[in-house]
UniProtKB/Swiss-Prot annotation:
Gene3D superfamilies: Knottin, scorpion toxin-like (3.30.30.10). It comes from Tityus trivittatus (Argentinean scorpion). The record marks K30 as: Basic residue of the functional dyad. Belongs to the short scorpion toxin superfamily. Potassium channel inhibitor family. Alpha-KTx 12 subfamily. The record marks Y39 as: Aromatic residue of the functional dyad. This is Potassium channel toxin alpha-KTx 12.2. Pfam families: Toxin_2. Disulfide bonds join C2-C5, C10-C31, C16-C36, C20-C38.
Length: 40
C-alpha cells in the first residue's frame, strides 16, 4: 500500500486519471495490480 494509491479497482491506467484528479489534483496515474496508483 502507498500514500498515493486509491482503493479502486481498475483495468486500464486511463480509468485512474479522473479519480486521481479528484483525490490529488493531478489527473496522472497508472493501474497497478488492479488498483490505481496516482502520481503527485
Amino acid at each position: 500500500w502507498c500514500s498515493t494509491c486509491l482503493d479502486l479497482a481498475c483495468g486500464a491506467s486511463r480509468e485512474c486519471y479522473d479519480p486521481c484528479f479528484k483525490a490529488f489534483g493531478r489527473a496522472h496515474g497508472k493501474c497497478m495490480n488492479n488498483k490505481c496508483r496516482c502520481y503527485t
